[in-house]
Design a protein with these regions (language model features):
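An acidic-aromatic substrate-binding cleft motif
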Residues: 52-111, 116-136, 308-311
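Contiguous, structured surface segment used for ligand recognition
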Residues: 1-79
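Substrate-binding groove of N-acetylhexosamine-processing glycoside hydrolases
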Residues: 73-77, 175-176, 216, 228, ...
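The substrate-binding groove and active-site-proximal loops of carbohydrate-active enzymes
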Residues: 29-32, 93-115, 131-141, 176-193, ...
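Loop/turn elements at helix/coil->beta-strand transitions in domains of secreted/extracellular proteins
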Residues: 82-85, 128-132, 157-160, 208-211, ...
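Gly/Pro-rich turn-and-neighbor structural signature
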Residues: 61-70, 138, 145-146, 151-156, ...
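Hydrophobic or amphipathic alpha-helical targeting/insertion segments
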Residues: 25-61, 146-170, 175-203
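Trp/Phe/Arg-rich N-terminal binding region typifying the photolyase-homology
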Residues: 110-111, 115, 123, 135-150, ...
């Protein structure tokens, strides 16, 4: 094994890589350069056999086979183009949350998306070669870290937990501030209580794999309280960043540069950033689309050179003004491909997060996004039409898949 790995040293060029190799004696070797890589390698073998990543979520029963063969000289080494790749469960009010808490794993009270559901979500993420998850956070839903068993199943599957642009420090602010907070969620007039609110979560999750969102907006997708002008908001945000990082340094790692952190200039926060906000060099800047698929800002040469790198938060599902798109997977795959290809080429390569709503019915767009995050050149090489055709044939069979392609 050691000689084989020496001969295939490219396996260790990046984290999360894997190798599938047929040995001279006919044995198949699956090797990962870390735990994630090993999982992705095993899932790749599953894909080769014909098992869909959506096997459970889409009732995609794999075709029965009596045998499966690989060439005697078969070697496949893969590793990700983007380091952190994941989804955001959002607008879960009518679909995922009631299905989870009332049907899939009924609780004594509704509102929980629990560990049994998350086990299925995290298995899907590994099958899609993803590793990051932003939990659902609407007021109807019990917070991820306040639901027994959730953090344990995230550790089991090796999933990094993050949070959206209005949930700093891994707190589901819309729900948790009403329970744990005191006074107004206002860093100008109530900073002591707000900081204590964040501190409680950081202390209890210090040993969890978390990609911390830092900064501050309003309680739920609105601008911050207490600061009226953009200049005031900029000054307050800089104080917030400093104080949040002190918490992370105190409880997570004294080397703050070793703690994954992301700042998300979403909606009005982009104006604050453009007003001259100073974001520490080691923090990842996560850019956003306009909620309809067009990225609002691509990193400059100075931003590309930052140690923290750049990320993207992208929507294929949205609830908000001027109109929603939630119930059908209507988002254009071609637009998704074009925007994400440009994002990667312009230096957005640290973290990609996709707002998938309830997961269903956007299976194809989700898989396209994750395939690009894993191998940015794969879709370009085969063409988006061929990529879609392969998806349809795998899910519905070759004949029906060909018939569906012109419809899709």
């Amino acid at each position: 094994l050691e000689n084989i790995l020496v001969d295939n040293a490219t396996l260790y060029e990046k984290k999360q890589g894997f190798m599938l190799k047929v040995l001279k004696d006919g044995r198949l070797l699956v090797v990962g350069n870390d735990s994630h890589g090993t999982a992705y390698g095993l899932m790749e073998l599953s894909r080769l056999i014909g098992v869909s990543p959506w096997e459970w979520w889409a009732d995609a029963t794999p075709e029965k086979k009596t045998s499966f063969r690989l060439p005697t000289d078969y070697t496949d080494i893969q590793f990700p183009s983007v380091e952190y790749r994941g989804i955001f469960i959002n607008d879960e009010d009518w679909g995922l949350m009631p299905w989870s808490s009332l049907t899939h794993e009924p609780w004594y009270k509704p509102g929980r998306i629990g560990p049994r559901t998350h086990e299925r979500i995290f298995e899907l993420l590994l099958r899609l070669r993803a590793n990051t998850y932003w939990p659902a956070m609407h007021e109807c839903t019990e917070p991820f870290f306040m639901t027994q068993g959730n953090r344990e199943v995230a550790r089991k599957y090796g999933i990094y937990i993050g949070s959206s642009h209005c949930e700093p420090m891994a707190c589901s602010t819309p729900v948790e501030w009403k329970r744990r907070g005191k006074g107004d969620y206002d860093y100008v007039h109530n900073s002591k209580e707000v900081l204590h609110f964040w501190e409680q979560r950081v202390k209890e999750t210090a040993n969890q794999e978390i990609f911390y969102t830092i900064g501050m907006r309003g309680v739920h997708d609105g601008q911050m309280q207490g600061a009226k002008t953009v200049e005031e908001q900029k000054n307050v945000t800089e104080h917030v960043l400093k104080d949040q990082r002190e918490l992370l340094r105190k409880y997570v790692n004294s080397d703050i540069t070793a703690v994954p952190q992301v700042f998300i200039p979403y909606k009005e926060v982009l104006d604050i950033y453009h007003a001259g906000l100073q974001v520490p060099e080691d923090v990842t800047l996560m850019w956003c689309d306009d909620n309809y698929g067009y990225i609002r800002h691509f990193p400059t040469s100075e931003e590309r050179a930052r140690k923290g790198g750049n990320g993207i938060y992208y929507h294929i599902s949205y609830w908000g003004r001027p109109h929603d798109y939630l119930w059908l997977g209507t988002f254009s795959p071609a637009l998704l491909y074009q925007q994400m290809k440009e994002a990667y080429e312009r230096g957005i390569q640290k973290i990609w997060i996709l707002n998938v709503g309830d997961i269903k019915p956007a299976e194809y767009q989700t898989e396209l996004f994750m395939d690009m995050a894993w191998n940015i050149g794969k879709v370009e090489k085969e063409g988006i039409s061929n990529h879609l055709c392969h998806f349809l044939q795998r899910e519905f069979g070759e004949e029906i898949g060909r018939e569906l392609l012109p419809i899709m």
